[in-house]
Swiss-Prot record:
GO cellular component terms listed in the entry, alphabetical order: extracellular region; host cell nucleolus
Region: Disordered, residue numbers: 27-51
Superkingdom per UniProt: Eukaryota
Name used for this protein in its record: Candidate secreted effector protein MPL124478
Biased composition (Basic residues): 28-40
Keywords: Host nucleus, Secreted, Signal, Virulence
Region annotation Nucleolar localization signal: where it falls in the sequence: 29-36
Location(s) in or outside the cell: Secreted; Host nucleus; Host nucleus, Host nucleolus
The protein's role, per its UniProt record: Rust effector delivered into infected tissues to modulate host functions and contribute to pathogen virulence. Binds the TGA1a-binding DNA sequence to repress the expression of genes involved in immune responses such as the defense-related transcription factors WRKY18, WRKY27, WRKY33, MYB51, the defense-related proteins NHL3, RPP8, YLS9, AZI1, CRK11 and the jasmonate pathway and regulation genes JAZ1, ASA1, ASB1.
UniProt free text on domains: The nucleolar localization signal (residues 29 to 38) is required for host nucleolar accumulation but not for the nuclear localization, nor for the augmented plant susceptibility to pathogens.
Residue pairs linked by disulfide bridges in the UniProt entry: none
Length: 96
């Protein structure tokens, strides 16, 4: 009888711990993850990918520039500081 009481207390404690842990992660008990902030699109991120800018690609690797940093503006790959893309190698084109 005494062990059942402790078992019930243990179950309640573990349940509370799980709820607190999920709230601390920002998940809560909601279908959408429970976070109070919605992810929003930022400029030049090519969709809702957590706010990270979309990077031009040479096949499966990130493209590099001779000057400046690579980015995708309006769906087209560009280099900052009037730079040019370094050669991808072969017939591979730079894509966004």
């Amino acid at each position: 009888m005494m062990s059942q009481r402790y078992f019930k207390l243990l179950v309640v404690f573990l349940g509370l711990f799980a709820m607190i842990a999920s709230i601390a992660e920002g998940k809560g008990r909601h279908k959408n993850g429970g976070g109070s902030r919605k992810k929003t699109n930022t400029v030049n991120n090519g969709g809702n990918n957590g706010g990270k800018p979309k990077v031009p690609m040479c096949g499966t690797t990130a493209a590099t520039c001779s000057k400046g940093s690579p980015s995708c503006k309006g769906g087209k790959p560009t280099c900052g500081s009037k730079g040019a893309f370094n050669a991808c190698g072969g017939n591979v084109k730079v894509t966004c």
